[in-house]
From Swiss-Prot:
Keyword Disulfide bond: yes
Any one of the GO BP annotations: defense response to Gram-negative bacterium
Main location: secreted
Lineage of producing organism: Eukaryota, Metazoa, Chordata, Craniata, Vertebrata
Gene: DEFB136
Protein name (database record): Defensin beta 136
Domain of life (superkingdom): Eukaryota
Length: 78
């Protein structure tokens, strides 16, 4: 693969929204991750704890019930 195509793919991967986007993201349901009562994201959003990898690039994240940071609160919900 030439350098131009590699750099384009690199920037596309960097620009992917990780965790919760502007309109919310419920994550991807993968059987190995849902058995832990968790979901898969491109990176754990604030308020989620990392557990394992899902399919090598996704992160299996579990919602934190205690000690959630202030960033975990959804600004769109009043």
């Amino acid at each position: 693969m030439n350098l131009c195509l590699s750099s384009l793919l690199f920037f596309l991967v960097i620009l992917l929204p990780s965790g919760k986007g502007m309109f919310g993201n419920d994550g991807v349901k993968v059987r190995t991750c849902t058995s832990q009562k968790a979901v898969c994201f491109f990176g754990c959003p604030p308020g989620y704890r990392w557990i394992a990898f899902c399919h090598n690039i996704l992160s299996c994240c579990k919602n934190m019930t205690r000690f959630q940071p202030l960033q975990a609160k959804d600004p769109w919900v009043h």
